[in-house]
Each structure stands twice: as structure tokens, then as C-alpha cells.
Amino acid sequence: MAKSAAAALHTEPKEPNFLQKFGHDFVHGDIFTKLSFFVWGLGYIGHGQLMKALLVTFVQGFALYFLAFFGVPNLAKFGTLGTVKMEMVFDVATMKNVVNDYDNSFEILLMSMISFIVIAALIAAAMMVVSSNYQLQKIRETGKKTNNFVQDINVYLNEKFYVTLLTLPVLGVVVFTIVPLFILIAVAFTNYDQQHMPPNELFTWVGLNNFFTLFGGGGMTSTFGYSFAKVLTWTLVWAFFATFTNFFGGILMAMFINDKKTKFPKFWRTLFMVTIAVPQFVTLLLVRNFFSNNGIFNTMMRNAGVTGFLQNIGLVDKGLSYIPFLTQPGWAMFTIIMINIWIGVPYQMLIATGVLMNIPADMIEAARIDGANPVQMFFRIKLPYLLSVQGPSLVTDFVKNVNNFNVIYLLTQGVFVTQNQALAQSNAKEVDLLVTWLFRLTQDYYNYKMAAVLGIMVFIVCAVFTVVCFHFINKKEATFS
């Protein structure tokens, strides 16, 4: 007890975080280390690294130049997103009508967001420069010689080569992911739509009005709340069935093909893989034509008497001479799920085949000796093993299906027309996912403000589902390890 108590009292100190390390280095640094926070090159000059001083001074100077000539002018207008509309004015000097010096709201928003990121990057970089100079200071205090520029380059080509490799990808993530994400979030709090399109018109901040509109608080005439509930419900239903029908369908197909009683397993496996070889968009466009009101499949059903039978039992309206596979909500939802099974099951079959082949043979043999039948072995051994291995894959498949644009859009675009006026007023359809509704709002109706809100909601749905699922998966990950 005494030893354990003493060990607890003498635990190793925690590694300081980034801010704590910067604070320590700045306080204990010499004058050059402190000055490097404000002028990056001064610290390196004082510590004998002239080439590095030139490089960091150039980077800092370029960033400050951008802020001075592009950042600050736009940040000054960030609160209003511009006040001067584009119009023609008479120029006395040329005696002609010319375009005035107008404000572009989107340019102001874009440059402001980039400026915020540049400012944050400058502060973080300045803190790292201070820590770097403090390390140089400590080396010089011990009488050792600091690295020259060539030696520093060699370090980043050897010991710290990971930094060199990650530099471009990180810049790509910032430019193509972080900046657009911030702009998306910002647009959700503006009135950016077809009536406020730059450069001819200005848009401005509207606070949480767009979110109130989405959740039914936009007044008596607003239908976005109703449409959002309908579309979100179908999105989750679709994602559930699209994920698990493919999952279990692929498992069953893999088990049947790999069964010892199955003849020519390689032939059947190759046959089902044909759907993978054909590009998905080609398959979807062809199938859309097959299942159209006047398509081949409807002709076959009508000639076989299936259409008449479905009319007699009430599944097809009496006034129709076809089965509305892609033109009525219920039929369209069912058809889309069935077509997705045809497209997705072969992928899952290949994955399940690999996993089933890796189930320990002694586990199956022990179950067989204990008298387990095939059904019991499936539910007690094979399915739990598959779930333990493919749990993370199922989560990503669900998120992928929430955002499965191709299947829904290519099967229904130009074919399905909603009869629901409330949905039509919100530019939505019964078969829309959140992502296809978002796409239609931007491309067809230029309603960027509501599309941005929907984008945020899609992220929230996917993030919450992923966090919850991985929380439970991590609890059970050691079951079959």
C-alpha cells in the first residue's frame, strides 16, 4: 500500500499542451525568441539561421500583404456583407454610363472567411516560431552548434519526412474542405437566394430565420418544416433498407455460392459481378427506361395480366394501364430499394465471401459436434462474426446511403412529378433524399440559404449516427478478437 501510494505521488508530469508550451517558451525565451512572435525572421537571425529567417519572413510578409489589401477591406464590410448595389452611373469625365464601384456580397463573405483562416494560421505559426526559436536558444546556451539550412532540409527529408508528405494534403484539405465548409455554414445565416444574387443584388445576415423556416417557424405559408420532416423520414428509411438489404442479401448470396452443394460456384460469382463491371450510372439510366410507364417491363406485366391483377387488389389505380414503378410515391420508393439491391448486393457478396472464409474452422467444427444446426450456426457464430468485422463498414455504408445521390436522382429525375402541393412549394419530392433536395434547391431554384441549412442538417444526422454507432461498436470490438 505504501509503495503504491508513493508511486501515485511520483507519477510522471503530463506533457504540456500546445498553449502551455508556447507560454513557457515565450516567458523563458530571450529577446530574439520574444521578438520572433511579431517578426518571425528576427528570432532566426538572432540565432544564426539566415536562410530560414528569409523564408519565414517571406511567408509572413505574403500573408500580411493579403490581409492588408484583400482581407481588411472585406472584413470591414463583413457585418453588412455590403451596402452599395451595382448600378449604372453617369461618368462626367467620359460622358458615358459606367458601372459604379459596387459591393459583391459573396466576394466579401469568401474573402472574409479566408482572412479569418489566415489570421488563425498566422497566430498558430507565430506560436510555433517562438517554440522553434526557444529550442535554438537552448542549443546555443549549451554551446552546441545549430543546424544550418542544408541540415534542416535533410531533417525534413529523413526524420521528419512525414511532415513533408503531409504538407500538400493538409493545404488541400484547408482549401477544398475547410474553406467551403465555413462558407456553407455562413450562407445558412444569410438570405442568399434567387432574389439576392450577386453581383446584381446584395444579400445580408438574417440570423436563425432560415432554421426557423426549416423547422416550421417561417409563417403560415411556409412548407419547409413539413417537407423537411417528410424528406428526413424517407432519407432514414431509405438508408436503413439500402444498407441492411444489401448486407444480408450479400451474406446469403455468398453462403449459397460457397455451399458445397452448389454447382459451378465460380460461374455464379462471376455472373453476379457483371453488375459491378457495368458503370452504375449506365445501369440506373437503363433500368429507369425499363421501368418507365411505357417501358419494356410494364409491357411484359400488362401482357402477362399482372397489371390487371394488381388493379383488382387495389395496388394500382383502375384508370392506369401501367404499373407506376417510378411515378407514384409508394411504388417509386419500393422500386428504388429493389433496384439498389440489384446494384449493391454483389459488392457485399464479395466482402462477405472473404469474411466467411476467415471464420476459424475449429469454431464451426465445435458447434457442429455440439449438435448445432445450420440456422443456429448462422445466428450464433457466422452473423456475430460478420458484424464484429463489418461493423465499421456498416456505419460508413449507412452514411454513404444517406448521401446516395446517384441512385435517387438518376432514377427519378425527369420521371417522378410530385402531386403534393406542400412539397412542391418547397421544391421537394416524396422520393427526395436530403442531398437530392439540396442539389435541386441550388441548381434549379438558386435557394442557397436553405440548401446550406440542409447541408448542415445532413452533417448533423451523419455525425450523430456515426458517433453513437462507433460508441457501441468499440464496446464489443474484443468479442471475436
Segments the model singles out, each with a brief description of its role:
Residues 28, 35, 80-95, 99:
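Intrinsically disordered, low-complexity, charge-biased terminal/linker regions in eukaryotic proteins
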Residues 2-32, 38-45, 50-53, 57-65, ...:
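N-terminal signal-anchor/first transmembrane alpha helix
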Residues 88-105, 371, 436, 440:
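Short, membrane-exposed interhelical loops at transmembrane-helix boundaries
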Residues 70-78, 161-481:
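A structural signal for multi-pass alpha-helical bundles of membrane permease subunits
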Residues 48, 69-87, 117:
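Transmembrane-helix bundle segments that line or gate the permeation/cavity pathway
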